[in-house]
Curated annotation (Swiss-Prot):
One Pfam family in the UniProt entry: Ribosomal_S3_C
A biological process from GO: translation
Domain of life from the UniProt record: Bacteria
InterPro entries: KH_dom (IPR004087), KH_dom-like_a/b (IPR015946), KH_dom_type_2 (IPR004044), KH_sf_prok-type (IPR009019), Ribosomal_S3_C_sf (IPR036419), Ribosomal_uS3_bac-typ (IPR005704), Ribosomal_uS3_C (IPR001351), Ribosomal_uS3_CS (IPR018280)
Protein name, UniProt field: Small ribosomal subunit protein uS3
NCBIfam families: rpsC_bact
Lineage of producing organism: Bacteria, Pseudomonadati, Pseudomonadota, Alphaproteobacteria, Hyphomicrobiales
Source organism: Brucella abortus (strain 2308)
Domain called KH type-2: residue spans: 39-107
Entry keyword set: Ribonucleoprotein, Ribosomal protein, RNA-binding, rRNA-binding
Length: 236
């Protein structure tokens, strides 16, 4: 089961939590869920170059709080915060609510599964050899503290006539172990021969306490070696 299912979904409520954190009445649920999808699609398209890892949406009473985890926060913030203010106004128009926008810097993009997948997909689009791209990503992740990593690439790799799947793994990736902190990300490479899919699993160690926020806290604070400053920029 652990080999097939999304490892983040399998661990929700154990050491992972949801990216949409709000409650709604039955009549409002569908509308708010559709809003979340539109917000994520808009930000992903608008901030293609910002290396976005994930987008967290929270909805306190009659408000909306959007947190963007990015490896390049400067691109989102812009000169003197001009770009982030434009984004905030657009999001307020989309949600019809008072919207705040927070930026959290991803300190180690080399061990973030989503950013690794995006990087490999971009290299495939630039015609870099898929084995070289995979091996380079694996070496960088292991060098920067990952305990294990697995990468799958599928499609017409290298322009082959028949689509196939190639994978590369180093270290341990225990998908059945629920206490394992496993990050998972996917991306698509639009090549001249068709779409190639990229999947990445990164094992970052084990989380022994039962805490749904443990993995996120480790990602935000762990890179700073215990420092209380996590360079969180907030624009209410």
């Amino acid at each position: 089961m652990g080999q097939k299912i999304n490892p983040i979904g399998l661990r929700l409520g154990i050491n992972r939590t949801w990216d949409s954190r709000w409650y709604a009445n039955t009549g409002e649920y569908g509308k708010l869920l559709h809003e979340d999808v539109k917000i994520r699609e808009f930000l992903t398209e608008e901030l293609k170059q910002a290396a976005i890892s994930k987008i967290v949406i929270e909805r306190p009473h009659k408000k909306c709080r959007v947190t963007i985890h990015s490896a390049r926060p400067g691109i989102i913030i812009g000169k003197k915060g001009a770009d982030i203010e434009k984004l905030r106004k657009k999001l307020s128009e989309m949600t019809n609510a008072d919207t705040s926008l927070n930026i959290v810097e991803v300190r180690k993009p080399e061990v973030d599964a989503t950013l690794i997948a995006q990087s490999i997909a971009q290299q495939l689009e630039r015609r870099v050899a898929f084995r070289r791209a995979m091996k380079r990503a694996v070496q960088s992740a292991m060098r920067l503290g990952a305990e294990g990593i697995r990468i799958n690439c599928s499609g017409r790799l290298g322009g082959a006539e028949i689509a196939r799947m190639e994978w590369y793994r180093e270290g341990r990736v225990p998908l059945h172990t629920l206490r394992a902190d496993i990050d998972y990300g996917t991306a698509e490479a639009k090549t001249a021969y068709g779409i190639c899919g990229v999947k990445v699993w990164v094992f970052k160690g084990e989380i022994l306490e039962h805490d749904p926020m443990a993995s996120e806290r480790r990602a935000v604070e762990g890179d700073n070696q215990g420092s209380s400053s996590n360079r969180r920029r907030e624009n209410a």
